[in-house]
Amino acid sequence: EYGTNVVAGVTPGKGGQMVLDGKVPVFNSVEEARTETNANVSIIFVPPPFAAEAIIEASDAGVKIVVCITEGVPVHDMVKAKRIIDQSGTRLIGPNCPGIITVDECKLGIMPGFICKKGNVGVLSKSGTLTYEAIGQLVNVGLGQSTALGIGGDPIIGTTMIDALKLFEADSETNGVVLIGEIGGQMENEAARWVKENMTKPVVGFIAGRTAPPGRRMGHAGAIVSGGDDTAEAKMRIMTECGIAVCESVAEIGDKMKAALNN
C-alpha cells in the first residue's frame, strides 16, 4: 500500500507457498530468501521467544537493515543478538518498535503512513503512539516529515537516540528533529548532551511519564524510574540545559518546532 517492495516472506516449514494474491514467495530461511530475491531489509513479526534468533539469522544472511516489531523479547536473548549485530554491521531498529517511514517513499513496519505529510522534520521516538501523535501535531501546523522512526522502548535496542540523531544531522532533507523520550534509563540525557555538542539543527523534546510513581514500570520494559536523573523532570531539565526546546505537553510539539525552524 505504501510502495514498499515486498519480495519474500520467511516461515520455517512453509517454503514454497505464495502469499499476497500469489505475488510473494515464502522461503524456509532468510538465507534462501536473500539468495533468491536479493532482499536487503528484513522486518520481523515473530513471537518474543524466537525474535532474537530471527534478528541473528537475518544478520548472518547478510541483511544490512533489520526492523523488529516484536514486543517482549527476553533481555538475555537481546544481549546476544546485540553483540552479534554490532560485529556484523547490521543496522537494527527495535525491538518493540513501530518501524521507520520515509514519507512518500518507503515504510518498514506498522506506522499509519496516511497520517504523514512530506516535509523536512525528522521524528525520533521510543513510543509508537507518541510518534503518530507528534506527526499529527506537526501536520496540524503545516509541517511535514522527512523520516520518522520508533527506536523501541525495551532496555536493549539496536539503534539508540544518538545513532538516529547522527543520521538526521547528516540528512540534507531534515531541517529539525522532534525527540520523544520517556522515564527510565539515561538514553535521553546522553542524547541531549550529544545535541549540545554536535547538533546544528533545532531539536524539540518531550518526555513521557511525568506522573509515573518510582519503581513501577509504565508500559515499556525500560520505562521505570529507579532514582537519580532518570525521572521526567530531570530529563526535561537536562534537555533544556542542552538547548533543546522542551514541551510540557505533546500538544505543544507542532508550535514549538514551527517556532524553532523560524528562528
Task: Describe each model-derived feature in a short phrase.
Residues 1-263:
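Catalytic-core regions of core metabolic enzymes
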